[in-house]
C-alpha cells in the first residue's frame, strides 16, 4: 500500500505528457542538461584558477625596503 508500482508511475507519466506536451518536456530536459553541464564546467574552471592566483600573488609583492617616488623639478618662483 505504501509503495508505488510501475503502473502508477506510467499513469503519472502519461498525465504529465498530456498536460505539458512532449515538446515542452524535451525543451525542459535539454535546458536542465545545459545547466548541469555549465555547472560542471564552472566547478572545473574554479579549480584551475586557484593555482594561477597563488602564483601571481608573490610576483606582485614589492620589496618592502624600497620606496618608489617621483622626482619633480623645483621651480624658483
UniProtKB/Swiss-Prot annotation:
PANTHER family: SEC-INDEPENDENT PROTEIN TRANSLOCASE PROTEIN TATA (PTHR42982:SF1). It comes from the Bacteria. The keyword Ribonucleoprotein does not apply. It is a single-pass membrane protein. The keyword Protein transport applies. Residues 39-51, 65-77 have a biased composition (Basic and acidic residues). Part of the twin-arginine translocation (Tat) system that transports large folded proteins containing a characteristic twin-arginine motif in their signal peptide across membranes. TatA could form the protein-conducting channel of the Tat system. Residues 39-77 are annotated as: Disordered. The Tat system comprises two distinct complexes: a TatABC complex, containing multiple copies of TatA, TatB and TatC subunits, and a separate TatA complex, containing only TatA subunits. Substrates initially bind to the TatABC complex, which probably triggers association of the separate TatA complex to form the active translocon. The chain crosses the membrane at residues 1-21. It holds the Pfam family TatA_B_E. This is Sec-independent protein translocase protein TatA. The gene is tatA. GO terms for molecular function: protein transmembrane transporter activity. One of its GO terms (cellular component) is TAT protein transport complex. Belongs to the TatA/E family. HAMAP family: TatA_E. GO terms for biological process: protein transport by the Tat complex. Keywords: Cell inner membrane, Cell membrane, Membrane, Protein transport, Translocation, Transmembrane, Transmembrane helix, Transport.
